[in-house]
Amino acid sequence: MDTVRKTRETAFDELCIKTQGFLDQMMSLGVTSCEAKSGYGLDLETELKMLRVIRRMNDEHPMDICATFMPAHAVEEKWKGREDEYIRLCCEEMMPQVRRQGLADYVDIFTEDSVFNADQSRTYLEKARELGFKLRIHADEIEAIGGSVLAGQMKAVSAEHLIKIDEAGLGSLSEGGVTAMCLPATSFYLGADFAPVRRMIDEFQIPVATATDFNPGSCPSLNLQFVMN
């Protein structure tokens, strides 16, 4: 939660300067398009601030940036044991404001045993779809608790991580036409397993993409060339 605290404390203009530096580094490595997620605010004010930074950068920087709203990235201490209430807050207060202001095209959620369960994720994603957002989901990074199955059922654009995906999840992604967004640099830095990409392609004909997952907690690299290797 240290990053959440620092993001809340940092002024909009300073966040823009930091973000511009990251984008410049990415462009120097040949990247011309990227996705940027919120998720280090966990409250409406800071989530909106992050999305406005993304919009400013998309307007002013040569990088083509796709914005994803992800308030359901973690569970703050005050919401532990009250995750249903937090999901309701996301659905009833946060998402409608983001949609009205046109700050994001996508919504994402971290479906994991220690974060949000599959039922909570379904409620969240159904509301996002109702409001016109396209769907993404962080699934099966630590345990397979139904996130990838849900991604297929909801026909999400992508499901991220998928390190622990099971047979049911593989089948659901394939049937739902979901892109498996595999993040090998995160596995590298955490010393974790890699997603079963070969099975995804050969046995289930799942479209596979890769990305850096550049973030302060689990992947300090924004080098897509490193990821591809």
Locate predicted features.
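Active-site-adjacent C-terminal substructures of enzyme catalytic domains
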Residues: 134-135, 143-229
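Metal-coordinating catalytic core of metallo-dependent amide/deamination hydrolases
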Residues: 3-20, 24-25, 32-145
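Alpha-helix C-cap/termination motif
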Residues: 29, 60, 100-101, 154, ...
